[in-house]
Swiss-Prot record:
Glycans are attached at residue 202. The gene is cnx-1. Residues 566-581 have a biased composition (Low complexity). Ca(2+) binds at residues 108, 427. This is Calnexin.
Amino acid sequence: MLNRKWSFVFLTFLLVISVNANDDVFEDEDEASESGVEKDEFVPSNFVAPKLADTSKPNFFDYFPVGSKIGQTWIKSLAKKDDVDSEIAKYNGEWSIGAPTKVSIEGDYGLIVKTKARHHAIAAKLETPFVFGSNKFIAQYDVKFEEGQECGGGYLKLLSEGAEKDLASFQDKTPYTIMFGPDKCGASGQVHLIFRYKNPVNGTVSEYHAKQPASIGTAYWDDHNTHLFTLVVKPTGEYSVSVDGKSLYYGNMLSDISPSLTPPKEIFDETDLKPEDWDEREQIEDETASKPDDWDENEPQNVVDESATKPYDWNEEENELIPDPEAQKPQDWDEDMDGSWEAPLIDNPACKGLSGCGTWKPPTIKNPKYRGKWVRPKIANPAYKGKWSPRLIDNPNYFEPKPFDGLAPISAVGIELWTMSENILFDNILITSSEQDASEIAKQTFYIKQQEEYRLAAATGSSNGIFQQIVDATNEKPWLWAVYILCILLPLIAIGVFCFGKGSKPAPNFAKKSDTYSPDDDRVPNLVDDQEEEIIAEDEEDNQPGPSGTQNQPPIDEDEQDEVEQQPSSSKTASSESSSAAEEEDNDHVVHENEPVQPTEEVAKKSPRVTGGAKRRTARRGD
């Protein structure tokens, strides 16, 4: 039967083999598909147009049905960006309405960015403007970065009232009320939420950014799948941003946006000026101080060490660096343009192992007389009045914000972005006040599309492996790395402690049942030291034979005597016959019944060889 700990190790080994076997199976499947054994052919499902209840009246909803064209609902911008070169000022990015490159649902179309490295702008008028009042505001859409994303956005601009009058003039300066959606450049991304809020006192409109999570990774852009972005803003100012139905971040307009929506009650008076006699210096130079007479400012900081001597192995005849003898002038070297060619310098091999080469110079050391430039010490300024600041006055533009009061009505939805990637597909754009409608649209569109994309990836072998999924999860939630490390280290530590943490138990010491010599006796260490031998000798003197001619031995236990007497005679005869030869050799060491027992020291002197077993027997008798 296997030891329990080795059984545990064996089971772990089997688990590793099984994982590798699964990997081999996947590889075999890939090889089989390459060798001609085809997987089940993927057949796209048919698109079913989403439907809302008759009572539902969203402000805007477009799922881009077959037959939709640019210029009908969606108007491409003809404007130019301000303050940029004319070559890149135009919004000349191309748009189309069509199917994605990899079709998972037949007949499911979307609005597609067809070009990269260009400015794109397009907008559509809402069926009914959204006015911020007692109802929630909900914006929802899905977007797919088919080519990934190097640098660019995928966000919506919810345009303020008035923009719908001229959608062809839509550009980056067009006023918007809310900007919402993903944006990425480089190795980091974010999901924007920006409010433009109007101060009711002075009429100024300012941008306020929702606080972002520390990191959301790049999976939304790099996995080439469709993702659903949902924004909910309540009249209380509470907002939540979700991706694929899962909360990404949330907060409140009154406390979690930057800068604060609530202006300060007091501000500095810009007309207040600092008095001319206001002294802000905490310390000043002591004008009464003078330089000490022994202060020499001309002493250098370092001086030559006069006590230094040249090392005995210093070679002044060799240079520390020499031209590389193996270097060759490049073939394209032009002496007229590049000057005279010189071989690069390398360390002189003749100086290897020496203290140095070339002209020897004594090293420098810190000058003990150096004191530097003298400056007057600082003292407290008797005229110090503290740090001056303008006086505070009541803020004339202060107001107590109510979240929805400063948000302008929304009349159009636009997409205005610069991107370095093409084939960005927007779909199922919804503006409403009903969370139920948003949930229903997501069920009828995104979740079906998500499952079909997974099915397509599985059928074509383009799905991400388990390792990539783990990495993608850590991009979204970096703290998962700590969980992964613990999940790996803790079992390894447990296995190590379980298998190797305990020492082996020492073998039990079994007492011999007879003094018969055995081959291992010579390898047993002498257990009697010099002091114990003296004690043994004294005990043996006390145990010399008495008048009766016998040694004063301790009484024999009655049970042992009976055990000896009960041994079969045949056993004794066989034992005596088998040991007759040994008795002849050990005759000198046997104490006969009628002979007095000699002291151990005398026996040792007469015996030509005292074995380890004999020493132990002597020690036991002495005890």
